[in-house]
C-alpha cells in the first residue's frame, strides 16, 4: 500500500498540493491541488519529466482527477514574502477544487493550510497525489511564462521561465527590470532604480502599497551599501 492509500484509508478524500515557480525572479507562484482516485502511470516529480511527458500526463490528470489551481502574483510575493505568497496560492488552489478534501499532502515542510494535512519533504517523489499536483502547477506556470514572452519578446521567458539563469540575468541588465519581476528579490532589487520604480507607479503598473514597500527596500539597501563602502575604506560612518 502506497503513502497516498494509507492517508486515504484514514482520512477519506485526500488532496496532493504542490507549487511551481517559488524560486523564480519573475512571474507568479502557481499552486495546484489534485484529488485523484484512478491510477495514472508515469506520475513523478514534474522536474524529472520532459515537457512533452508533462503535457501528456496533464491531459490524463485533467480527465481523471479533480484539479484546483491557485496563483499568487509578483505583487503579492513582494508584499507578503514568497513563503506566505506560496501558502496563499496553495489555499486558493484548494478553494478551487470541486471536491473538498478532508486532508492534504503538501510538498515541503512547515506549511499549514486551510485544510488539515501534513508536509512531505520531496513529497513529489513519494506521493502520486503530490506528483500530479506538481505536473499541473509546472505546466500551467510554464504556459503563463510563455505568454509573458509574447508580451516582452526581449526576455526569453518561454525558455528560462523566470528563473535566475545566466541568460535571464543578462536580459535584465540589458533591457531593465519589468513590473512582472519580483522587485523585492535580489538581484532584481540591485538592478532597480528609484526612477524606474516611480515610473511603474505613475503608469499604474504597480500599486501604491507595492511602490512604498520596494522604495523602503531600496532605501535600506543603499544604506547597507553605504556602510560597507565606508567600512571597506576605513572611513567613519557619519
From Swiss-Prot:
Keywords on record: Cytoplasm, Endonuclease, Hydrolase, Manganese, Metal-binding, Nuclease
CC annotations in GO: cytoplasm; ribonuclease H2 complex
Cofactor-binding details, from the entry: Manganese or magnesium. Binds 1 divalent metal ion per monomer in the absence of substrate. May bind a second metal ion after substrate binding.
Enzyme nomenclature, EC number: 3.1.26.4
Catalytic activity as recorded in UniProt: Endonucleolytic cleavage to 5'-phosphomonoester
Main localization category: cytoplasm
Pfam name, any one: RNase_HII
Residues that coordinate or bind a divalent metal cation: 18-19, 107
GO biological process, one term: mismatch repair
Cofactor(s) required, per the database record: Mn(2+); Mg(2+)
Coiled-coil portions: none
Task of the protein: Endonuclease that specifically degrades the RNA of RNA-DNA hybrids.
Protein name (record): Ribonuclease HII
Taxonomic placement: Bacteria, Thermotogati, Thermotogota, Thermotogae, Thermotogales
Gene that produces this protein: rnhB
Amino acid at each position: 500500500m502506497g503513502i497516498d492509500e494509507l492517508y486515504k484509508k484514514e482520512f477519506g478524500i485526500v488532496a496532493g498540493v504542490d507549487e511551481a515557480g517559488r524560486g523564480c525572479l519573475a512571474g507568479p507562484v502557481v499552486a495546484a491541488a489534485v484529488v485523484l482516485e484512478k491510477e495514472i502511470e508515469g506520475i513523478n516529480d514534474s522536474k524529472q519529466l520532459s515537457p512533452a511527458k508533462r503535457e501528456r500526463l496533464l491531459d490524463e490528470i485533467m480527465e481523471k482527477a479533480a484539479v484546483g489551481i491557485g496563483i499568487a502574483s509578483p505583487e503579492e510575493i513582494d508584499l507578503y514574502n514568497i513563503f506566505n505568497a506560496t501558502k496563499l496560492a496553495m489555499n486558493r488552489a484548494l478553494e478551487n477544487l470541486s471536491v473538498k478534501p478532508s486532508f492534504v499532502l503538501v510538498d515541503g515542510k512547515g506549511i499549514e493550510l486551510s485544510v488539515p494535512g501534513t508536509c512531505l519533504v520531496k513529497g513529489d517523489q513519494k506521493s502520486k497525489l503530490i506528483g500530479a499536483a506538481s505536473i499541473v502547477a509546472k505546466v500551467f506556470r510554464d504556459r503563463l511564462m510563455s505568454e509573458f514572452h509574447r508580451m516582452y519578446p526581449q526576455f526569453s521567458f518561454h525558455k528560462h521561465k523566470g528563473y535566475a539563469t545566466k541568460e535571464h540575468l543578462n536580459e535584465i541588465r540589458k533591457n531593465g527590470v519589468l513590473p512582472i519581476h519580483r522587485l523585492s528579490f535580489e538581484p532584481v532589487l540591485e538592478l532597480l532604480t528609484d526612477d524606474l520604480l516611480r515610473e511603474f507607479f505613475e503608469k499604474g503598473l504597480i500599486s501604491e502599497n507595492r511602490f512604498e514597500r520596494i522604495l523602503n527596500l531600496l532605501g535600506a539597501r543603499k544604506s547597507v551599501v553605504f556602510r560597507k563602502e565606508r567600512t571597506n575604506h576605513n572611513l567613519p560612518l557619519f
